[in-house]
Amino acid sequence: MIFAGDTHGMLSAFQRIDERAREDEEPVVIQVGDFGVLFAPECEVADYFRTREGGPIWITCGGNHDNWPLWRTMPEVELFGGKVRELAPGCFFADRGTLLTMGQNKILFFGGAESTDKHMRVPGVSWWKEESPTYSEFTHFFEAMEEHKPNIVVTHDAPVCVPVLRHGNRGEQPTPRGLDNVFSLSAHKPARWYFGHHHHLDSWTVGETEFHCCGLNGEWCRPPGLGGLHVARPIR
């Protein structure tokens, strides 16, 4: 299993990660948002998925630079014990609160974040208000954390308690604040938490949980097997 960083619709990043997954016989790529597939009507990455032969299954949690309203109209299918949206053949979106079970891993998804550049974007064309999770979605996320006790969580942004170095006050942004509330209030602490949004490859430990920022444009993280130590490295 590979955890891929922000791709922003860059075809070469998808091709590099696909190539590595094939070489290493990894059947699944989990992507941490700002995916870029179907961001615009003409999408070369969607065309790539429609024509590629074989390769891993891709699953994204969605980021702030993704077309949430469109994605939520795509066909719903069952995958790994949960329901996801099929964006293209072999390419899926796991909406907020989706739980998927892969072998011994229970993986809980919760995408979205706030765009700091939304003043430069066009509503309904390059920015969508659904980028930010609602109160009810955070409530569902908390309840899923308590009920299902996932060992892996996948989000686009990270809780405030993760010391990510980035411009701006993350404590004033609704999504990292909401994620922090869920993490701090839940009695369950996942073993690993993968996220993107911050465009660098790094890791931290907060309490019992390893947090891993998965990088940008072809960078990725991978835990060896179903357990063991975390490995983080870029694809070049």
Each language-model region and where it sits:
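Structural motif
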Residues: F3, V28-V32, I152-H156, Y194
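Active-site-proximal loop/helix segment associated with metal-binding centers of metalloenzymes
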Residues: G82, G103-G171
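Active-site donor-binding loop signature of nucleotide-sugar glycosyltransferases
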Residues: R96, G112, G124-V125, C214-L216
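Core catalytic region of metal-dependent phosphoesterases/phosphodiesterases
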Residues: A4, G9-M102, G178, L185-S186, ...
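Beta-strand-turn-beta hairpins that frame and shape the catalytic cleft
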Residues: M1-I2, T98-F109, I152, T205-F211
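Conserved beta-sheet core of the metallophosphoesterase superfamily
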Residues: R50, I57-C61, G81-R85, P89, ...
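Active-site environment of divalent metal-dependent phosphoester hydrolases
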Residues: H8-Q15, G36-P41, N64-R72, L99-L100, ...
